[in-house]
Amino acid sequence: MVRQSISLKAELEEIQNIFPATYKIFFLKIKCSNCGEIPDKWIGLDKSNIEVIGKSNVNLATKCKGCNRENSIVIEDTDYSSRTIESEKDFEIARFDCRGVEIEEFDPRDNWIVVSSSGKEYKDVDLEEGEWSEFEERTSTSLTILSIESSIKKIK
């Protein structure tokens, strides 16, 4: 079993927080821990998809094409909605319990919630292009997210 977290880092202007929506689908590339096989296709993983393996509920059950090993991933319950993040510093966006696989790549895509410095929430934000901007008329401020980078870490 390997627990991993995904963090983002970006240049932020007038942004207080970024976190995945409840229905966020995480697009990942995974590597089999047994044979090292990395499929070419992105795998979509979301909390609402629950599969039963033995006595466990998992969000993804997959079989490695290289060695036929059964593997699984569970998205851990976390709440990032009440924090404040800083520009150009890593901030965690998800944790995973991986059995038989390791996360190799992450593609942010869509379904993010962005909170401005004034507290206004923007829903269904798409970060696929690596940047996002909006003008908040109420406060006459420009909101920007630039140079998004992701990192994957093993955690205890």
Swiss-Prot record:
Domain of life: Eukaryota
Keyword Metal-binding included in the entry's annotation: yes
Gene Ontology MF term list: zinc ion binding
Signal peptide extent: none
Keyword field: Metal-binding, Zinc
Family: Belongs to the UPF0587 family.
Organism per entry: Dictyostelium discoideum
Transmembrane segments: none
UniProt remark on domains: Requires a bound zinc ion for normal folding and solubility.
The protein's name: UPF0587 protein
Residues bound to Zn(2+): 32, 35, 64, 67
Record's keyword annotation contains Metal-binding: yes
